């Protein structure tokens, strides 16, 4: 359970609250009840709704807590990642938020492409047996299937929208 200290706005776990109370000459207690929290000037932080990603690049990330109209505190989630302009340092050049986002998307695309290619390679390996001379299969159908697997990286939706061919 997470708890928010009213006087500081600090959010902590229950064990941290117990240590905080002890370090600040506060009380000790067995069970954390509403009465205990009120005496400590603290509130429970409830789990808020996750943000809903709209594409392959986004994810739900926590960004603090917020209070609702009834006064209860909830975890706050936003869509990430969040990019901001970064000034140059001694070791790295300045980078705009747009440049960071483009690099992030390129990295995500490359990782996804590698995963799809790995899956495609495994499917090709799994069907190698169909190409031996004495395999009791329709060689033309299996050859077409294997060619369709090789063509996966040329599909319009690659690497995120793949139409996998059906095995013969």
Q: Would you name each region that the model predicts?
A:
Residues 1-168:
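A preference for well-ordered globular domain cores
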């Amino acid at each position: 359970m997470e708890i928010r200290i009213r006087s500081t706005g600090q959010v902590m776990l229950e064990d941290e609250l117990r240590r905080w109370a002890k370090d600040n000459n506060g009380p000790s207690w067995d069970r954390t009840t509403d009465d205990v929290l009120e005496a400590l000037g603290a509130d429970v932080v409830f789990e808020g709704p996750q943000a809903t990603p709209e594409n392959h690049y986004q994810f739900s990330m926590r960004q603090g807590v917020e209070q609702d109209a009834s006064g209860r505190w909830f975890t706050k989630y936003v869509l990430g990642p969040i990019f901001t302009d970064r000034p140059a340092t001694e070791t790295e050049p300045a980078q705009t938020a747009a440049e960071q986002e483009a690099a992030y998307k390129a990295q995500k695309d490359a990782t996804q492409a590698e995963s799809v290619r790995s899956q495609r390679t495994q499917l090709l390996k799994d069907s190698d047996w169909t190409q031996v001379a004495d395999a009791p299969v329709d060689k033309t159908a299996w050859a077409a299937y294997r060619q369709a697997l090789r063509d996966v990286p040329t599909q319009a939706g690659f690497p995120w929208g793949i139409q996998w061919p059906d095995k013969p």
